[in-house]
């Protein structure tokens, strides 16, 4: 493969859409605020949904009023930690339990109390980073051709001053 010369960038302070359309995420630079935070990257042009979850064994049960999902649908999801443990971020097929709850089968097992926060999207989850308390820029370079986003790159941040991406 030849060198790609049409790499572009996008910069944002806060949560939001970084770029729409089919692109490959090549590089991510972010700066923390001095408080531990997180950055979650999704393949979507719409804001991911905030919900709560619990895990028992391999089963993660997500609660969101009127979630509107159907059994067999795939969601990209990332989870906050409870007592330094979280469910495994990724892309999962859902089983609808009620109009307000659905479940996914985690890759790992354990117990996590209910009412722990999570974020999901009907687009794909691409990557996540938990940040420490350092106030210095960090860079994540994605090897090869980068991470493919079919729809766009939407970033959800907590305690992040800014993020910059390079894509092509």
Question: How should each PLM-predicted stretch be described?
Answer:
Residues 1-21, 33, 156-168:
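C-terminal interaction-tip segments
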Residues 48-125:
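Small/polar beta-strand repeat architecture
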Residues 26, 35-40, 73-75, 161-163:
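Short beta-strand/loop motifs in extracellular/secreted proteins, especially
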